[in-house]
């Protein structure tokens, strides 16, 4: 995945930031959001 500079404590928090970044799916790893490119 692609790490974006968004802090998180759970994967659901990453859905919108990943969408806003033009990607889909978000996972929280090491307190940062990781997105899957389209």
From Swiss-Prot:
Q: What else is known?
A: Negative results: shows weak inhibition of large conductance calcium-activated potassium channels (KCa1.1/KCNMA1) (Ki=1560 nM). Shows weak or no inhibition on Kv1.2/KCNA2. Shows no effect on Kv1.5/KCNA5 and Kv3.1/KCNC1.
The residue ranges crossing the membrane are none
Please tell me one Gene Ontology term that the record gives under cellular component. extracellular region
The subcellular location is: Secreted
- Could you list this entry's UniProt keywords, alphabetically sorted: Disulfide bond, Ion channel impairing toxin, Neurotoxin, Potassium channel impairing toxin, Secreted, Toxin, Voltage-gated potassium channel impairing toxin
Q: Which Cys-Cys disulphide bridges does the record give?
A: 8-28, 14-33, 18-35
Found in which tissues?
Answer: Expressed by the venom gland.
Keyword Glycoprotein assigned to the entry: answer is no
Q: What is this protein called?
A: Potassium channel toxin alpha-KTx 3.1
For whether the record's keyword set contains Transmembrane, the answer is no
InterPro entries listed in its UniProt record: Scorpion_toxin-like_sf (IPR036574), Scorpion_toxinS_K_inh (IPR001947)
**Sequence segments annotated as region (Interaction with Ca(2+)-activated K(+) channels):** 26-33
Its function, per the record, reads: Potent inhibitor voltage-gated potassium channels Kv1.3/KCNA3 (Kd=0.65 nM) and Kv1.1/KCNA1 (Kd=41 nM). It appears to block channel activity by a simple bimolecular inhibition process. Induces a transient period of fast flickering in the channel openings, followed by an almost complete blockade of the channel. Its binding affinity to rat brain synaptosomes is 5-fold higher than this of KTX-3. Binding of the toxin to the channel is associated with significant structural rearrangements in both molecules.
Question: So what family is this one in?
Answer: Belongs to the short scorpion toxin superfamily. Potassium channel inhibitor family. Alpha-KTx 03 subfamily.
Domain of life from the UniProt record: Eukaryota
Which GO terms of the molecular function aspect are on file?
Answer: ion channel inhibitor activity; potassium channel regulator activity; toxin activity
Q: Which Pfam families match?
A: Toxin_2
**Alphabetical list of PROSITE patterns matching this protein:** SCORP_SHORT_TOXIN
In its UniProt entry, the species of origin is given as Androctonus mauritanicus mauritanicus
């Amino acid at each position: 995945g692609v790490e974006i500079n968004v802090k998180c404590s759970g994967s659901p928090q990453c859905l919108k930031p990943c969408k806003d970044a033009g990607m889909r799916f978000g996972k929280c790893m090491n307190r940062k959001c990781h997105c899957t490119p389209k």
